[in-house]
Amino acid sequence: MCPHSVHAVIAVKSLDSAKSRLAGVLAPAHRSRLVLAMFTDTVRAAAAVEAITGITVVTPDPAISAAARALGAEVHPEPAGAGADPDALNTALADAATALRSRYPDSGVLALQADLPGLCPQELAAVLTSAPNDSRALVADHAGTGTAALFAPAGIPLRPRFGRDSAHRHRTDGARELHGDWPGLRQDVDTAADLAAVQSLGTGPATAALLRELELPYRVRETVTQVCGPVPAP
């Protein structure tokens, strides 16, 4: 399948509470800046995919909202009471997906993690090409337990189940797992080991610039196309 159009949805927590498992590597202010940089590289990579015709960001954070708009994305308001919701991420994604369905009933919806600084556009293009048109599909993260991306074609609810063991939860809820060599898509960043792994892949320019400033080891990705190659036509 290669859908005519897809809208990507990305949910991002407040920068104040982001990436606590990197506390042993980065100070709080630097963790916030890292989240913002990784988000920027993720959005830029998604925006470079021809089939992705729009990106919507759900966040309570004004800095993320401002960055999203500067990158050409829309900002969807976080659902009321989300701060007290133990399943706030899935509630936010589902709410945004429902709103998108009402506006673009013929488009697919792709829920994407916000911390994929090594993401290459052709990885997402390949995912959308291989995704079924009659059911949801997931791409597991590098550990095989989480979900890097969840796709729902037109007419099928997204039904996000992100969180602990989300890959298993999505599979048991009917989503088909897609298998492909997509290391940048699968490598989210939660721990120091994850940060080292994505540095070995090469990161997008925003993340690379921050790592350079912080004098952490890095490989600079000057442009997405230089390292990833051209995005295949749909």
Language-model features: locations:
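N-terminal nucleotide-binding beta1-loop-alpha1 segment
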Residues: 1-22
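A short, N-terminal amphipathic alpha-helix
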Residues: 35-52
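Acidic donor-binding segment of Leloir-type glycosyltransferases
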Residues: 51-75
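Short phosphate-binding loop-to-helix
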Residues: 67-108, 166
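Catalytic metal- and UDP-sugar-binding loop of GT-A-like glycosyltransferases, i.e.
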Residues: 112
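Conserved donor-nucleotide/metal-binding helix-loop-beta segment in metal-dependent transferases, i.e.
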Residues: 116-145
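Short, glycine-/small-residue-rich phosphate/pyrophosphate-handling segment
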Residues: 148-175
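Conserved alpha/beta core of the MobA/IspD/sugar-nucleotide pyrophosphorylase nucleotidyltransferase superfamily
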Residues: 165-234
